[in-house]
Each structure stands twice: as C-alpha cells, then as structure tokens.
Amino acid sequence: ENLFLDLDDYDFVDLRMILGSLDQESFSLIGRSKMINYWRRNSKYCGACGKKTDFISSEEAFQCSCNNEFIYPKISPCIITLIHRGDEILLGRSKHFPKGMFSTLAGFIEPGESCEEALVREVKEEVGINVKNIKYFSSQNWPFPSQLMIGYFAEYDSGEIILEDEEIEEAYWFNLNKLPSIPPEGSISGLLIRSYIEDHS
C-alpha cells in the first residue's frame, strides 16, 4: 500500500498566510506540531560539547552523555499589547509586514523581567511613550518559531511617538472608525484589536 500523498494537486503555504481561515483548535494543533518539529531539528547535537544527543522517549526530551541533562522544547515568552487612548489605538508597522498592514506592539521578555516590566520597556523602546493600567487579555502559542505570546491592554499615559527601534517603520494613533489593514482574527494581535473595538463601539 502506498502511504505517501500525491502532492501534485497541493501547494505548500506559509502558515501565517492561512491564519484567518483556521479555527483556534486547528491553529493550536498545527502550532504545536511546528514547534515540536523545530525543536527536534535543532536538538540533535549538544550545545555544551557538540556530541550527538539521544532522544529519550520516556522523558520526551533529548539527552547528552556529557552532562546527562535533558533538553526540553524551548519556549520564548513575548508580550504583545494594544495601547489605547479613548477611541484611538496605537498601531505600528514592522518592515516584515505585508504592505499596508499595522499591528499591536510586541517584544521578548528579558531575563529577570516580569511580563508587565517587559511591556513597559518594550513600548518605551519602540515608540517612546509611557503606559499605565496594564490588563491581561489572553495568550497564544506562536510557532514562528517557538514563542508564547502573552497579550495585554495598556492605557496611554504620557509622551509622544518617537521611533527608536529599527524594527518599527511607522507608528500612529488610529481612530477606531478609520483603521488600516490589521492582522487576521486568528492571531492574538487581531483578537486584541477586535476585542477593544467591540467593547468601545
């Protein structure tokens, strides 16, 4: 029996491109698969000595004989935040985004930081403003390649937009009735934006 798929009638697509057509359960399943595959590809050799590692099925981890430590999947925590000011929200545009798309701000949590501290720092570094009244929204696995996105709402406090991060090309305040192209609902950034609109419409 032929167990291989005939792929002549199929195309490989970037997972980001089909976010809008996936329900949360499907995205979580695909995301888990992608993250585990990335971890397995990048854990074949020990980072301490360079020797080939062994996969220990009972532990679901790789292990090297040089120190017997287990190598588990690594997840990088990131904050992502929607900054609001009444009927306006602050959205930024990364150079990696599709043309015309704007999104919420995000960044990695550094060692020793809480989520809230990382949020305040990232916002200040990226757009130069201060925020207050930080409120947790939700989280989402983000397999590009292995992030956990931790979403928050944050209220504008003070300052003017000053772009100090090379990743951000543009950032503006947008009225809720005049938004640019935004991420799909399947992404946590899209969910943050739509949730705020629903609560303030």
Where would I find each of the regions flagged by the language model?
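The catalytic Nudix box helix
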Residues: S103-S138, Y152, E160
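Nucleotide phosphate-binding site architecture
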Residues: L90, E110, P180
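N-terminal strand-loop-strand
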Residues: S58-S103, N130-V131, A154
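Short, contiguous, pocket-lining structural segments
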Residues: N37-R41, P73, H84, S94-H96, ...
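Nudix hydrolase/Nudix homology domain
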Residues: E1-S43, D54, P98-F102, E164-S201
